Structure formats: C-alpha cells, structure tokens
C-alpha cells in the first residue's frame, strides 16, 4: 500500500502529471519568447502582429503576467494533489488480465471479427480505447471551457470583474496564455482539466499526456506565430490565428472555443473564420508598396 506521502514524493505518473504541465509551459514560452526577441526574418514572416504592438496594445507589465501565471500553476498543483489524495495511488495495471477481459468481450459479442482479425482485442486495448478516451477528454474540456468562457463574456459584471484580466493582452503572446483572474484560472483551466480527466477515466499515465498536451496547446494558441509545419496548428483548426481573432475588438464575441476544436462555435453561431492576411502581413505589404512608390 503506497501512502500519500510516498505518492507525492517519488517520481511516478501522479507526480509527473503535476509537474510536466508547469515545465512544458515555461519551456514553450521561453522558446517563443526567444523567437520574438531575436526577430529573425525567417521566423518574422510568420508573425500575426508586428512586434511593437505587444508593447503598445497590451496593458500588463510582463512581471505581472509572470506572477499571475505562477499563482495559477500553484493552484493547479494544489488541486492536483487534493485529487490525488482523494483517488489514492492507482493499483498497477495487470495487462494480461486486461487482455483476457478484452478477448472475452470479443469472443462473446464479436466472434466473427475475432476470427478474421485475431489481433482486434490487442488493437482495441492499446490504441482504439485510449484514442476514444483522449477524444472524449478533449470534447469534455472544450465543452466546459466554451460555455464558461461564453458566459463570462455575456455577463458584463463577471466580465469586468474576472475575464477582463485576460483581455488586457490584446496581442496574445506565449507567456501570457495563462494570464487570468485566479477565479477564472481555477474554474476554466484547473477544474475543466480535472473534470475531463475524471469523465474520460484516464489513467495517471494518460493524464500526463493529456495535461501536458492541453498546456502546450494553450501556449501555442497564444504564441503569436502561424508556422506552416506546427503540428498543433496543422491538425487543429482552433489555433493561434483562430484564437487571436477573439482577442481583437472585432472578434470579441466570437471564437469562444478552446483549446482543441471549433465545434461549439460552429454549432452555436459564434464562429469567425481567420482572415486571409494577418496584421503583420498587411504591414509588410504596405512597407513594400511605399518602397516601390
């Protein structure tokens, strides 16, 4: 029997799931921050906004952003510890026993498939069921965040008290992805991820991937760049350009979906398609036109 102290003071999937999102947040933020600092032309052409707009349009000092993000991450770790204590340390998975259960299920319900594809139980156990769990977790966290996010916009009092904090950053950048009012960070991000984890029945190992990917996706959505071969922007329509529109005055009541899909925006009429040109591209075209003239 593993005690709570042992669970939280040894390197195991539970502690990794608490620490890895914090690490990936600052590593990814540092990477995009470095690109912003060096301003190499090979990367600059993929900017969404000209660099001077970050200082001109954002109304929060970067040190205040750092403090707010660290506080939210502290809250996330505390809630994660509480959840781990409530659940207890998970028993080791007996894969042989699990495979016997899958084989018994296929033998009883899908005997014809088992004859044609004897590998079906193993495929289901290793790939199909985990993939469904992840997809369901994505759907749950998206649904949770969409409706809370939209409510915080439509309720003017709550917007001014809470969500307006995040919109002080009119030009998103990576490090500011989790710059929120503490209440918003707790309800939308921390509780949203926790509810999705529980609803999908993720294992601690799966939780490491889910929490880390969700955090990386959030940073990438605020990074301020549209890189052509960024896998997170290639495979998800809900990306940096899409979310940037929500931070602009003309897209303020659109594109509430986050962090993975755009499903609810399409269904409920709050979808705004990304524009063909970014503000940075428009500025560069104007510069080139002046040079020609």
From Swiss-Prot:
Keyword ATP-binding included in the entry's annotation: no
Disulfide bond in keyword set: no
InterPro entries on file: Fatty_acid_hydroxylase, Sterol_Desaturase_Related
Tree of life domain: Eukaryota
Enzyme Commission number, as recorded: 1.-.-.-
Compartment list: Endoplasmic reticulum membrane
Membrane topology according to the record: Multi-pass membrane protein
Transmembrane segments: 18-38, 68-88, 127-147
Gene Ontology molecular-function annotations: iron ion binding; sphingolipid delta-4 desaturase activity
Gene Ontology biological-process entries: mannosyl-inositol phosphorylceramide biosynthetic process; mannosyl-inositol phosphorylceramide metabolic process; sphingolipid biosynthetic process
Pathway(s) per entry: Membrane lipid metabolism; sphingolipid biosynthesis
GO CC, any one term: endoplasmic reticulum membrane
Every Fatty acid hydroxylase domain range: 136-270
Pfam families assigned: FA_hydroxylase (PF04116)
Chief location bin: endoplasmic reticulum
Keywords, in A-Z order: Endoplasmic reticulum, Lipid biosynthesis, Lipid metabolism, Membrane, Oxidoreductase, Transmembrane, Transmembrane helix
Function: Involved in the response to syringomycin.
Family that this chain belongs to: Belongs to the sterol desaturase family.
Protein name per Swiss-Prot or TrEMBL: Sphingolipid C4-hydroxylase sur2
Organism annotation: Schizosaccharomyces pombe (strain 972 / ATCC 24843)
Top-level taxonomy: Eukaryota, Fungi, Dikarya, Ascomycota, Taphrinomycotina
Gene that produces this protein: sur2
